[in-house]
């Protein structure tokens, strides 16, 4: 391929990603997995009173992929065949027991297939080396599958079983299945199928995101099979995966979908690190905005797709990509979440550290704006990686990719980048000089080994893999520039690269992608493979000619002997321009990031005297420089300038209106006071201050910055008081906090307008957080509040008694909604990634039920609001609902509600009737049960690593029925 062809191919790959990145369901290119497909095939549903296998196409996929020996595919590792065969055997057995609508296969044929599958699995288990297995979660998945098969009457004995159970015990020693009930994202959510019989699936529903559990079809299938209520959203998710994932309607599903972040940042980081100019590529801005928004929304730590739980790999590579795209972001949240004493962890409870994850964290630090700030962490990662190489005698085995060349490639890139920073004084040398020397020696050994490993046809890998060959070529292109490389080895490297590129350029019937990537089973991805191949071909094309004098290295790229860096590899200028975006040179060397590329145009061109906040762009005082479509200041918040006019800005024309008949006056403080009169009156009356205390208590865990916390406290106070103004009007209340309600003083219309006005003032306060997610949270919460209030008014005005469940749903929207708004805003501003909303909703329900009880029984309430105000308002509160539904044939209480009585005698009669139905005793029992559940949740959070929270316990204790 010519350089232009390579650039066009890279742009086409970016376009492929960008066209789908805004799909609300996400995208993914992971290959179909027999294992997950088998689990989805086992979902049944009752339709028109008939049990039906819901996804018959998945079962057909399983049948069509059974091998002659009775087993299923071993993509690249023996664990693939074990998991694929175990899950498929389980599916076959269950379809044999319950054929339902499946008529495409006879019982005899199915029985024969089961026998062959059983024999194949026994053979696989007998030959399995358990200790050599690295795949994610195998230690809990295989034992679980063996138990499920035993339940179906199929048992297996094999020599490695005892060792397998030891590893399972070790894995689960720090984990209890009940952790899944907590509002904390744990990796076990990706494998709920391993916990059938060990958990109540109804209690994990709060972890569902867009119809899936940690984007896993098999985990989602297990939930659908064992939850007591059918979930249409999960069904819709799986139908979408079957139709739109890599199986393309064949019935096959991947081990994860979507994987939008992972399969965006891996190709982009691969292309950007080798110098592809993607800033002008179609759709790059969509991807950059998507990634930056995800980074902000998830507070600096991300997973393979939004809101599935963060990992160091995806976090580091997203940060790397954003920095290379001139959207600088901080690494601080990543370090806080994943840094350990001697290495960086991928997830919170991983059994063994990942080599590649530590490489990616290291690369993110090395490409950060100021790598010198993270010298200690850089050295920590280097020490860990170097030790992994030396201890294993270069036999490094990673848990996410099966190819040794993948780990070597990442290490080579890291060493090259580290050396470049040290040579340019951007980073100090390592304190341990022996490691510094060892790294260069290591790179020399890696290069020598890679050259020797090349196959006669120019490929690398056991299967003549194009993707592995790309890894190897990339390694050699970095090693080529090493000063320590002898001329003889440099020549051999050049020949190996040329032969490798010839192999990569061959058009064959074989797919370029390879089964190298590790999930529950091994998978391949066409976009990952294409990115590595394009990267290898570009790095190779950028090598100097054989006859050129060896050149110094700038940012890992030879200047090919030219003294000035405006010529790279003999080519004058970049992109055919002398001045790009107002800078005088276009050598592609970014003074902030020092990207290893030859044709980037977004840097400071190495001018240290240019302020960092402009990234080298200099604007004239009275004229706007032409930007050629690139972004000023290097951020996606700036709008491209075309012909001197911002595409995103309107053109304002000054017109003199001094003689106009009407000129709008400024809004005055006196006018503001008129609108806020009812609000200020109610604010002046002392209340319980419960919400402010709740915020402070949760901040023990969330540790929100003071400036943000002050805004949130103000917003919640404003919104609470404004909603009370409206509530008092709609409930026709007389007293509020022992004083006349605001609308009895200011009038109904003025009080209502004041309440609505403050809703918008509160929204303006939320905007001060400068967090797009906070705006969405606020708007969604207002919608919930009005939904809750609307249903309560409907029941009252239509005299329809809701069920207890309907009432609690209303409370979750109304009272709980305001509680949740406070904590959701705090979570949006915090760095800790724990979902406290289930606990907050529980506290909101407890608070409201207690309030309902005290409204009818407390003398303090009588003083503040009148005796049994809920009866006077005709309101269906929790004890009233129970009493009415305890004896539906007795209409006395509902008729009293209809009258909205003000007479104390009638109210006392209603209370005595409610005593006769044991409604107050029932309410006390419900509160006790809910408070126990809340305490258990709080203790679970604390046991899971959060500090003891006395404040929340005090708030819970205050939610009392004591009169």
UniProtKB/Swiss-Prot annotation:
Function statement: Bifunctional terpene synthase that possesses both prenyltransferase and type II terpene cyclase activity, converting isopentenyl diphosphate (IPP) and dimethylallyl diphosphate (DMAPP) into geranylgeranyl diphosphate (GGPP) and further converting GGPP into copalyl diphosphate, respectively.
Cofactor note (record): Binds 4 Mg(2+) ions per subunit.
Motif (DXDD): 311-314
Residue sites binding Mg(2+) 4 per the record: 727, 731
PROSITE patterns: POLYPRENYL_SYNTHASE_1, POLYPRENYL_SYNTHASE_2
Placement of sequence motif DDXXD 1: 727-731
Free-text comment on this protein's domains from its UniProt entry: The bifunctional copalyl diphosphate synthase is composed of an N-terminal type II terpene cyclase (TC) catalytic domain and a C-terminal prenyltransferase (PT) catalytic domain which are separated by a linker region. The conserved DXDD and DDXXD motifs are important for the catalytic activity, presumably through binding to Mg(2+).
Region (Disordered): 627-657
Motif segment (DDXXD 2): 851-855
Outcome after substituting residue 727 to A: Impairs PT, but retains the type II TC activity, converting GGPP into copalyl diphosphate
Geranylfarnesyl diphosphate synthase (PT) as annotated region, ranges: 660-963
UniProt name for this protein: Copalyl diphosphate synthase
Alphabetized UniProt keyword annotations: Isomerase, Isoprene biosynthesis, Magnesium, Metal-binding, Multifunctional enzyme, Transferase
Binding-site residues, Mg(2+) 2: 311, 314
Residue stretches in coiled coil: none
Any single Pfam family the record assigns to this protein: polyprenyl_synt
Residues binding dimethylallyl diphosphate, per UniProt: 736, 814-815, 848, 855, 865, 875
Source organism of this protein record: Talaromyces verruculosus
Any one GO molecular function term: metal ion binding
Residues holding Mg(2+) 1: 311, 314
Residues the record lists as binding isopentenyl diphosphate: 688, 691, 720, 737
Residues spanning the membrane: none
Annotated segments matching region Substrate binding: 227-292
Lineage: Eukaryota, Fungi, Dikarya, Ascomycota, Pezizomycotina
Named cofactor requirement(s): Mg(2+)
Subunit structure: Homohexamer.
Catalytically driven reaction(s): isopentenyl diphosphate + (2E,6E)-farnesyl diphosphate = (2E,6E,10E)-geranylgeranyl diphosphate + diphosphate; (2E,6E,10E)-geranylgeranyl diphosphate = (+)-copalyl diphosphate
Gene label: PvCPS
Assigned protein family: In the N-terminal section; belongs to the terpene synthase family.
């Amino acid at each position: 391929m010519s350089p232009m062809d390579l650039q066009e191919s890279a742009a086409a790959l970016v376009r492929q990603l960008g066209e789908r990145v805004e799909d609300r369901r996400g995208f993914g290119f992971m290959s179909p997995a027999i294992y997950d497909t088998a689990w989805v095939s086992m979902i049944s549903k009752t339709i028109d009173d008939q049990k039906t296998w819901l996804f018959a196409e998945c079962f057909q996929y399983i049948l069509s992929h059974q091998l002659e020996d009775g087993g299923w595919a071993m993509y690249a590792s023996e664990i693939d065949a074990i998991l694929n065969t175990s899950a498929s055997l389980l599916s076959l057995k269950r379809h044999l027991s319950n054929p339902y609508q499946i008529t495409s296969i006879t019982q005899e044929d199915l029985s024969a297939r089961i026998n062959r599958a059983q024999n194949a699995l026994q053979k696989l288990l007998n030959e399995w080396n358990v200790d050599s297995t690295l795949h994610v979660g195998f230690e809990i998945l295989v034992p679980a599958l063996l138990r499920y098969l035993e339940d179906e009457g199929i048992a297996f004995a094999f020599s490695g079983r005892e060792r397998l159970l030891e590893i399972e015990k070790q894995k689960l020693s720090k984990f209890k299945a009940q952790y899944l009930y907590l509002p904390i994202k744990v990796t076990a959510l990706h494998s709920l199928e391993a916990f059938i019989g060990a958990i109540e699936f109804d209690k994990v529903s709060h972890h569902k995101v867009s119809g899936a559990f940690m984007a896993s079809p098999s985990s989602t299938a297990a939930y659908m099979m064992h939850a007591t209520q059918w979930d249409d959203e999960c069904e819709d998710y799986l139908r979408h995966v079957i139709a739109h994932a890599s199986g393309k309607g064949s019935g096959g599903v991947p081990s994860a979908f979507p994987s939008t972040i992972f399969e965006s940042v891996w190709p982009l980081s691969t292309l950007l690190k080798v110098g592809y100019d993607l800033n002008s590529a179609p759709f790059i801005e969509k991807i950059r905005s998507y990634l930056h928004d995800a980074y902000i929304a998830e507070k600096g730590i991300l997973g393979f797709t939004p809101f599935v739980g963060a990992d160091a790999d995806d976090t580091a590579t997203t940060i790397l990509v954003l920095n290379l795209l001139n959207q600088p972001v901080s690494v601080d949240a990543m370090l806080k979440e994943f840094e350990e004493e001697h290495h960086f962890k991928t997830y919170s409870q991983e059994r063994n550290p990942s080599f590649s994850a530590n490489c990616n964290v290291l690369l993110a630090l090395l490409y950060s704006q100021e790598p010198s700030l993270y010298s200690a962490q850089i050295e920590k990662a280097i020490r860990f990686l170097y030790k992994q190489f030396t201890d294993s005698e270069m036999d490094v085995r990673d848990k996410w990719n099966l190819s040794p060349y993948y780990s070597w490639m990442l290490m080579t890139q890291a060493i090259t980048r580290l050396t470049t920073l040290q040579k340019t004084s951007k980073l100090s040398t390592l304190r341990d000089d022996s490691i510094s020397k060892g790294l260069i020696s290591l790179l020399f050994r890696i290069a020598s080994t890679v050259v020797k490993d090349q196959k006669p046809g120019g490929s690398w890998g056991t299967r003549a893999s194009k993707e592995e060959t790309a890894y190897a070529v990339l390694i050699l292109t970095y090693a080529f520039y090493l000063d320590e490389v002898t001329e003889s080895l440099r020549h051999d490297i050049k020949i190996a690269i040329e032969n490798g590129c010839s192999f990569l350029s061959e058009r064959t019937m074989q797919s370029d992608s390879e089964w190298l990537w590790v999930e529950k089973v091994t998978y391949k991805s066409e976009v990952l493979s294409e990115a590595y191949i394009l990267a290898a071909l570009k790095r190779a094309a950028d090598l100097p000619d054989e006859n050129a004098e060896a050149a110094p290295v700038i940012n890992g790229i030879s200047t090919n002997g030219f003294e000035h860096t405006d010529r790279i590899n003999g080519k004058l200028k970049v992109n055919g321009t002398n001045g790009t975006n107002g800078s005088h040179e276009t050598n592609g060397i970014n003074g902030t990031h020092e990207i290893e590329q030859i044709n980037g145009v977004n840097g400071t061109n190495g001018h240290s005297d240019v302020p960092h906040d402009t990234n080298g762009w200099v604007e004239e005082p009275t004229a706007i420089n032409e930007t050629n479509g690139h972004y000023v200041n290097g951020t996606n918040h700036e709008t491209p300038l075309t012909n001197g006019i911002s595409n995103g800005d309107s053109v304002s024309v000054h017109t003199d209106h001094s003689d106009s008949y009407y000129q709008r006056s400024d809004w005055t403080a006196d006018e503001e006071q008129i609108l806020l009169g009812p609000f200020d009156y109610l604010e002046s009356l002392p209340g319980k201050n419960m919400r402010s205390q709740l915020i402070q208590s949760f901040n023990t865990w969330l540790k929100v910055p003071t400036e943000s916390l002050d805004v949130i406290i103000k917003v919640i106070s404003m919104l609470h008081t404004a909603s009370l103004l409206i509530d008092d009007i709609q409930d026709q209340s007389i007293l509020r906090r022992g004083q006349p309600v605001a609308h009895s003083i200011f009038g109904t219309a003025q009080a209502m307008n004041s309440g609505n006005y403050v809703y918008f003032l509160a929204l303006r306060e939320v905007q001060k957080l400068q967090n797009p997610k906070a705006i969405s949270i606020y708007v969604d919460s207002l919608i919930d509040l009005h939904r809750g209030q609307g249903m309560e008014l409907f029941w009252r005005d239509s005299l329809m008694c809701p069920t207890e469940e309907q009432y609690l749903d209303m409370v979750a929207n109304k009272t709980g909604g305001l509680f949740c708004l406070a904590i959701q805003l705090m979570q949006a501003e915090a760095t800790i990634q724990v979902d406290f909303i289930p606990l907050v909703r529980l506290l909101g329900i407890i608070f409201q039920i207690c309030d309902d009880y005290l409204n009818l029984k407390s003398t303090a309430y009588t003083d503040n609001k009148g005796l049994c105000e809920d009866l006077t308002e005709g309101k269906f509160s929790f004890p009233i609902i129970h009493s009415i539904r305890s004896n539906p044939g007795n209409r006395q209480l509902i008729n009293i509600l209809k009258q909205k009585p003000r007479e104390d005698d009638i109210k006392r009669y209603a209370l005595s009737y409610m005593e006769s139905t044991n409604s107050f005793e029932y309410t006390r029992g419900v509160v006790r049960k809910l408070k126990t559940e809340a305490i258990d949740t709080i203790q679970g959070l604390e046991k899971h690593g959060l500090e003891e929270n006395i404040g929340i316990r005090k708030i819970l204790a205050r939610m009392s029925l004591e009169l």
